[in-house]
């Protein structure tokens, strides 16, 4: 099973990884263009509403996407498509009920929750909640099937439509409305295309499942609710900062902070892609889970840390890309980038605990990061604006890391700290050194990343197996030449490579 898992993770993560890169590129292009044709106030209002919608989506989903994925991962691997169909149908029923209930509550409490927004934005927000919730569930189902190539294609289509439509609408109607309409179209279009893809998976299935609808409904709900609470708290802890920025510091400051936050979310998404594919695999495994988790955490950090650490020393240049008004976000960006390392480890341990069925530990890890964040938001945002919000987020990530390590110790989690420290510190040294020489930030960041990988190869912190596993996410005609080239370099740098 371990050998199968490595193949499945590599294959499944291939398209998710590329999809995340494309989503990241589309996202940066989206907010870059908006920053050029609108104002920070428009971005602040739009982004805070999107953050509220994200919280509402987490409530409406009732944790069903993650809860159902735990069962679907094993069912798909065993080829029991009739049973998988029952799980999918049960999940859709629960999520639909959650959307209806959440919409009713939102309409009743609209003055309290959305008092700062116009009526048309509230209506669009409800549509966005429904579309996004269904989209996330269907996306998780396809991830569980490991047929993630479909996600890549659908994301390219939906993201392109969102970007083009929003640019057109900004010049025609109110800027905030155009942003929310664009965000609504993408998940709705994706959900429709995902639905057709899932239908094709079950096209040849018979109605002879061993699962009963009501019984499956209860099992999924029991597994989902325990995952729902920590997931909801994590969502609130990460998203409420932008909402509070709007309420306390105003739309301008909220927009600046949101851009910095999105940059970090885009980088972190690469690790989340690997861990998302790993979850259904880990749930289906009986042995070797801890080793697989360590490999995933290490590979993810090897990919993102050289970049994220380098950006810390050039944060002002990065924020200036979006316009001179956004340079205030350089310090918040630096603080948020620090959170990448602790978040990757704590999220990985949390996924392993959920795969083990230790829901209480998942809840504790989630609360350990989200509750301190919320408390710190109230303390730091009034006095330190975006810097306070970023500091609160990162402090919550560090506390979550500490708690996850305490929990992980009980299960003998495999973490090679020597490798982790070097993966973090080597890019730090190069980026700091280059930043003292007034190089243009683009070549400086590239040089820092290249030198970091050379040293990691030289001292065998990145091994031949790491390279092969990392490149397995790419198509073979691309991966093989890269692997051969890197292996040649590694062999020249270290004879024992």
Describe the function of each predicted region.
Residues 123, 152-202, 367-373, 386-407, ...:
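Hydrophobic alpha-helical transmembrane segments
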Residues 7-65, 103, 128, 163, ...:
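Signature of the first transmembrane helix
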Residues 1-9, 176-182, 194-238, 277, ...:
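Interhelical loop/hinge segments that connect adjacent transmembrane helices in multipass membrane
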Residues 131-154, 284, 337-368, 410:
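Membrane-interface junctions at transmembrane-helix termini in multi-pass inner-membrane proteins
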Residues 2, 435-497:
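Membrane-proximal transmembrane or re-entrant/amphipathic helices at the cytosolic face
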Residues 32, 61-78, 144, 260, ...:
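Helix-loop junctions and terminal segments of transmembrane helices
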Residues 11-28, 158, 182-198, 211-280, ...:
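Transmembrane helical elements of multi-pass membrane transporters/channels
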Residues 110-125, 251, 311-347:
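Interfacial segments at transmembrane-helix termini and the short loops linking adjacent helices
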